[in-house]
């Protein structure tokens, strides 16, 4: 893989790790104590991170 392709793979790996961590937070007790607006922002962030990861996976698949 080219250097820019390797960076995309690394970025996808790092993002996947962050998504797992955020998912755990969203299921935890602290999340339920946050105000409604902050919970909404975090849920939207989670969804957008998933979309971002999907695009990275599409890009990586196209490297083949």
Predicted regions and their residues:
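Extended, charge-rich alpha-helical interface modules
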Residues: 1-64
């Amino acid at each position: 893989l080219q250097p820019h392709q390797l960076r995309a793979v690394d970025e996808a790996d790092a993002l996947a790790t962050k998504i797992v961590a955020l998912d755990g937070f969203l299921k935890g007790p602290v999340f339920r104590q946050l105000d409604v607006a902050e919970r909404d922002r975090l849920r939207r962030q989670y969804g957008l991170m998933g979309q971002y990861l999907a695009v990275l996976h599409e890009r990586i698949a196209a490297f083949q």
